């Protein structure tokens, strides 16, 4: 009977996830040839990365892309094209050829919702909850606002909707906390998946992986140096494999040097951001918090989730129930993650100075580790805290300034609250969770309008890549490559679309990471070629309308081998 109830809970979660997907996003985005909703900001970058990768023969490293963002090239990682899925699609195209370009973002969103529900259900069932309360708690996780916010913000980022990886990692942590069980194979699979989806999700997963690893090391009765070498010996094989995978997928494909880290989350964790509704709340109670942009962290959890966390925390630990008390370590570790990985901590919209934030990280990290394991001497704790803080600050803005690590705290807080309520309420847990689900649904109703406006409807006639007759008539004869001259952020999207349609290399364009020194040298050389009219055969240059170009425009026009076409906000410079 219990197996039947579990099967019904699984079917219920899958049905709810599919229904929510249809209501919020619509089945129209599952059409692989429907691309009209992707041609903006980060989604466009991932779309172009995937399709340029499909155009090229597979070469080493597997995730590298040479014809997109020329002359340096890029990779699946730095276009956020979900490397594992892109490789799967490329293998599928080899076996069963199909027309490209295509998009997989719609299917990725659906898979994320389904796995979010399944991993949430698995977590609660694994911790001894009955199927019905596990099902109800999973519904809140599927409708988690911070998850769906990734699809409707000003620059959508569908790759980061893989929150199921955080839930899977938290489930493994709970397995260690309650049963002292460490499944190395499960962790290895999880880390391998996350490194081939997105760097942020990998770091979050790896951070949670360190909890049982470090705690097991601390429990050994040996010297600090002996513990360190044992830890190094046990973890080196997995770290070596992950490093090899990172190389294969293109993590190191972009040259080092003066590289931009933009696109990897220049955000801060605001301590009240979990109350910031961003207009998603139906209660109106948190409207005064609106306007705290770029402070992700919790985002807004929803009134149902906030109430459940409040009720769970107010019930207090149960006497003589050590596992419940031990579970407090999870939100403590989440706090460590926030303060150790964010140098910009906000309070009511005001960001603390980097130095003060670093001191706060150091103190909280020491206090948290001492709280978890009082047997630790102060010296190694301070050493660990100082080393972590120093390394993170040396890593630059890629990690230290992101408030997205607050996602861990949001999930950990809710999970801890549900497990706490299980012991307090017992049979009354299901009615209470049902009430919280209804409150959550009522509060988040305005979110529907935000999402619906961002996604295409099934009755829209236009779905593929837009044609551009003006570019078609200008590009004669057909060029061999297209170069873009201008500022860092200058990228004419219609030109990149045209280049993809005609299988032409294009670049350089703005991507999350590029070598500024190499780009600057390339731009200077390109500018000299523009002034002298020295275009190579089959080359087209899209030049941004800058003051410098306007001053020298007549000089460029005098070159007999060059013709200039005004495209509105840029010039096309072509050979005659």
PLM feature segments, named:
Residues 18-115, 144, 157-158, 277-281:
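Membrane-interface coil-to-helix junctions
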Residues 333-334, 379-383, 415, 421-449:
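Signature aromatic-anchored transmembrane alpha helix within multi-pass, membrane-resident enzymes
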Residues 40, 235, 241-316, 324-325, ...:
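Periplasmic/ER-lumenal interhelical loops and adjacent helix-loop junctions
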């Amino acid at each position: 009977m219990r197996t039947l109830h579990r099967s019904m809970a699984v079917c219920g979660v899958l049905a709810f996830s599919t229904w929510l997907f249809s209501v919020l996003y619509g089945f129209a985005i599952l059409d692989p040839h429907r691309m009209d909703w992707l041609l903006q900001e980060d989604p466009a970058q991932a779309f172009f990365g995937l399709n340029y990768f499909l155009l090229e023969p597979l070469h080493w490293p597997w995730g590298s892309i040479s014809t997109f963002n020329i002359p340096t090239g890029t990779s699946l990682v730095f276009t956020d094209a979900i490397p594992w899925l892109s490789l799967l699609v490329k293998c599928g195209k080899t076996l069963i050829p199909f027309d490209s370009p295509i998009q997989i973002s719609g299917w990725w969103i659906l898979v994320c919702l389904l796995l979010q529900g399944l991993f949430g259900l698995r977590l609660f069932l694994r911790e001894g909850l009955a199927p019905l309360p596990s099902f109800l708690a999973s519904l809140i996780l599927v409708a988690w606002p911070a998850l769906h916010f990734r699809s409707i913000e000003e620059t959508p980022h569908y790759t980061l909707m893989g929150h199921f990886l955080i839930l899977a990692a938290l489930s493994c942590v709970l397995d260690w906390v309650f049963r002292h069980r460490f499944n190395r194979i499960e962790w290895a699979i999880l880390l391998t998946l996350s490194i081939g989806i997105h760097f942020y999700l990998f770091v979050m997963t790896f951070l949670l992986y360190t909890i049982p690893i470090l705690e097991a090391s601390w429990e050994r009765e040996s010297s600090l140096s002996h513990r360190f070498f044992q830890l190094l010996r046990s973890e080196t094989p997995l770290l070596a494999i992950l490093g090899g995978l990172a190389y294969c997928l293109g993590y190191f494909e972009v040259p080092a040097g003066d590289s931009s880290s933009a696109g990897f989350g220049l955000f801060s964790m605001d301590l009240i951001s979990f109350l910031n509704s961003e207009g998603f709340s139906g209660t109106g109670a948190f409207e005064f918090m609106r306007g705290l942009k770029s402070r992700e962290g919790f985002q807004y959890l929803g009134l149902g989730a906030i109430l459940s966390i409040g009720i769970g925390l107010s019930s207090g630990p149960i006497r003589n129930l050590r596992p419940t008390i031990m579970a407090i370590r999870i939100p403590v570790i989440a706090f460590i993650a926030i303060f150790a990985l964010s140098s910009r901590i906000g309070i009511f919209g005001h960001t603390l100075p980097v130095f003060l934030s670093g001191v706060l990280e150091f103190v909280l990290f020491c206090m948290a580790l001492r709280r978890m394991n009082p047997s630790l001497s102060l010296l190694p704790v301070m050493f660990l805290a100082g080393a972590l803080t120093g390394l993170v600050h040396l890593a630059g803005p890629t990690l230290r300034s992101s408030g997205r690590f607050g996602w861990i705290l949001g999930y950990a807080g809710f999970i801890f609250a549900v497990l706490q309520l299980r012991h307090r309420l017992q049979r009354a847990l299901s009615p209470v969770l049902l009430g919280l689900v209804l409150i959550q649904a009522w509060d988040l109703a305005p979110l529907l309008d935000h999402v619906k406006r961002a996604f295409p409807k099934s009755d829209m006639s236009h779905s593929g890549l837009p044609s551009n007759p003006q570019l078609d008539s200008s590009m004669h004869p057909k060029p061999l490559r297209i170069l873009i001259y201008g500022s860092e952020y200058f990228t004419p999207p219609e030109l990149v679309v045209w280049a993809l349609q005609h299988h032409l290399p294009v670049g350089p364009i703005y991507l999350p990471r590029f070598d500024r020194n190499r780009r600057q040298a390339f731009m200077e050389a390109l500018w000299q070629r523009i002034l002298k009219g020295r275009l190579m055969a089959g080359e087209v240059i899209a030049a941004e309308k800058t003051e410098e170009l306007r001053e020298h425009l007549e000089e460029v026009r005098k070159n007999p081998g060059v013709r200039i076409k005004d495209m509105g906000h840029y010039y096309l410079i072509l050979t005659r």
